[in-house]
């Protein structure tokens, strides 16, 4: 069993959870929640600027 990291916030994703998004060029992005998915794909937000993201630069 492999534990993946969220492409947006860096949280651990357990097997059977999360969203896998495949781009048209074949790369896969894994997200822990819909909140991360929408922030990254739809709104194209920078995770370093959001307070709730673990990847945030301090």
From Swiss-Prot:
Its cofactor is Zn(2+). A zinc finger (C4-type) spans 6-36. It holds the Pfam family Ribosomal_L24e. One of its GO terms (biological process) is translation. Binds 1 zinc ion per subunit. The keyword RNA-binding applies. InterPro entries: L24e/L24_sf, Ribosomal_eL24-rel_arc, Ribosomal_eL24-rel_N, Ribosomal_eL24_CS, TRASH_dom. Zn(2+) binds at residues 6, 9, 32, 36. PROSITE patterns: RIBOSOMAL_L24E. GO terms for molecular function: rRNA binding; structural constituent of ribosome; zinc ion binding. GO terms for cellular component: ribonucleoprotein complex; ribosome. The keyword Iron-sulfur does not apply. Keywords: Metal-binding, Ribonucleoprotein, Ribosomal protein, RNA-binding, rRNA-binding, Zinc, Zinc-finger. It comes from the Archaea. Part of the 50S ribosomal subunit. Forms a cluster with proteins L3 and L14. Binds to the 23S rRNA. Belongs to the eukaryotic ribosomal protein eL24 family. NCBIfam families: PRK14891.1-1. This is Large ribosomal subunit protein eL24. It comes from Pyrobaculum islandicum (strain DSM 4184 / JCM 9189 / GEO3). The lineage of its organism: Archaea, Thermoproteota, Thermoprotei, Thermoproteales, Thermoproteaceae.
